[in-house]
Design a protein with these regions (language model features):
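Structural motif
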Residues: 1-2, 30-33, 72, 114, ...
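Nucleotide/pyrophosphate-binding catalytic subdomain
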Residues: 1-257, 262, 421
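Flexible loop/turn segments at secondary-structure boundaries
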Residues: 11, 41-42, 148, 185-187, ...
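Glycine-rich beta-alpha junction loops
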Residues: 37-39, 221-223, 272, 276-281, ...
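A conserved active-site cap/scaffold subdomain adjacent to cofactor or substrate pockets
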Residues: 242-288, 292-311
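A conserved regulatory-domain signal marking ACT and ACT-like small-molecule sensing domains
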Residues: 283-440
Length: 440
């Protein structure tokens, strides 16, 4: 069995839903489909929640009514028979009435999670009904029945495997199974989610639990590219990536794949394939455990980075200095992207500036602090083990005319990263492409 995940844009219109349905049914294979909410729906549900936090029931009801009209229009386009139009409209009406029920009560984060969950519940029901109307044997499963996190908000993989296995045993003989993308229950049985973007994670967790033959992530892009096509004109799709390479690219800016997605698949040894709904026959990108020795695969960039430098003579020959610095970032739950040290200073980069002022105030206890905003991280990804001679020369040659604030290498064998000004990003990405991939 293959797991196929389709994001919000892939099911964003009735026509897109029909295309996805045709794709999964015409293959003749037994597949497990993971669907996100229709594009724009989650934003609307979050908007409803924001109104309810402010006790603005009228504002919430306006958004609910507009969203309901939109969905009822989709029903008319999607189905060809009155029976399935009526069935789906009745289901959607009950969903929107459920959303309206929240406008009358106390509103907390618990209610917000219930509201946000409804987008995927609606999209999966619509696609399942359409497939059934087309005569396909389809089984709609609620992710709330088998997706669960533990007390640390981490996926409970053993529970997922056992519960999903039992559910599938009770529902044998279907060609297609469908479930929701990021909703789950927490350790206390409450409706929760794997955070936005977690539908990739869900697909990977389900694939590992089955175990699947392959996990496919479908978007409207032809796999991962060797550079950012929005910035660099001459990019190419990457045909193969190692799991570690894919994780680096996902973290450093490749929006096509969520960074957490590859971990369950990697540990289960299940390949992940990135495919394009607009060009289903395209090869896409395969992610597996194969590592091509000495091969540089791609360049990526992460924007909105802030650099922080602490300079202190007290750091010289001192022990425990870095621990104190790290404890400040931990206290404010702010992850560090890059770090470099010298005898009397340490430089770090962060992408979450929510508590920047508090962090800087705390750091000033230990030395002089300087902050640089509007920075970005450019990283080169591939098999960059230190024993592979020559890649450093190529990379540094490409960056020779770009002012570099920090360089990080050695924490991973799969990337070398540069912190530069955002204004220099386009030039850096183009230079790296020219030197690394086109030998200019």
């Amino acid at each position: 069995m293959k797991v196929m995940k389709f994001g919000g844009t892939s099911v964003g219109t009735p026509e897109r839903m029909k295309s996805v349905a045709a794709m999964v049914s015409e293959s003749g294979e037994q597949v497990f489909i993971v669907l996100s909410a229709m594009s724009g729906t989650t934003n609307s549900l979050v908007e409803i929640s924001n109104y309810l936090y402010k006790k603005n029931s009228d504002g919430a009801n306006d958004v609910i009514n507009n969203l309901e009209r939109k969905y009822m229009g989709h029903v008319e386009e999607l189905y060809s028979t009155d029976e399935y139009k009526q069935r789906t409209k009745e289901f959607l009406a009950s969903e929107f009435n459920y959303l309206r029920s929240f406008t009358k009560d106390l509103f907390t984060s618990f209610e917000e999670k219930n509201i946000v969950a409804q987008g995927e519940i609606m999209s999966t029901n619509m696609v399942a009904n359409y497939l059934e109307e087309q005569g396909v044997k389809v089984c709609l499963l609620s992710a709330l029945d088998f997706m669960r996190t533990d007390k640390n908000a981490e996926p409970d993989s053993q529970y997922i495997k056992e519960k999903l296995g039992a559910i599938l045993k009770e529902n044998e003989g279907y060609q297609i199974y469908i479930t929701q993308g990021f909703i789950c229950r927490n350790a206390y049985g409450e409706v929760d989610n794997l955070l936005r973007g977690g539908s990739d994670f869900t697909a990977s967790l389900i694939g590992a639990a089955l175990p699947a033959e392959e996990i496919q992530i479908w978007t409207d892009i032809d796999g991962m590219h060797n550079n950012d096509p929005r910035v660099v004109g001459n990019t190419e799709a990457i045909r193969q990536l190692n799991f570690e390479e894919a994780a680096e690219l996902a973290y450093f800016g490749a929006k096509i794949l969520h960074p957490t997605c590859v971990q369950p698949a990697k540990f289960a040894g299940i390949p992940v394939r990135l495919k394009n709904t607009l060009d289903p026959k395209a090869e896409g990108t395969i992610i597996d455990n194969v590592l091509l020795k000495g091969k540089i695969k791609a360049v990526a960039a992460k924007d909105n980075i802030t650099a922080i430098k602490i300079k202190s003579s007290r750091m010289l020959f001192a022990t425990g200095f870095l621990r104190k610095v790290f404890e400040i970032f931990e206290c404010y739950q702010t992850p560090i992207d890059m770090i470099t040290t010298s005898e009397v200073g340490v430089s770090m980069s962060i992408d979450n500036t929510t508590h920047l002022n508090e962090i800087v105030d705390e750091l000033k206890k230990y030395g002089t602090v300087t902050v640089d905003s509007d920075m970005c991280i450019v990283c080169v990804v591939g098999d960059l083990d230190w024993s592979n001679l020559g890649f450093e020369t190529l990379v540094l040659d490409a960056m020779k005319n770009i002012p570099v604030r920090m360089i990080s290498y050695g924490g991973s064998n799969y990337n070398i990263s540069f912190l530069i000004r955002e204004s220099d990003k386009a030039r850096a990405l183009q230079n790296l492409s020219d030197v690394l991939f086109y030998k200019k």
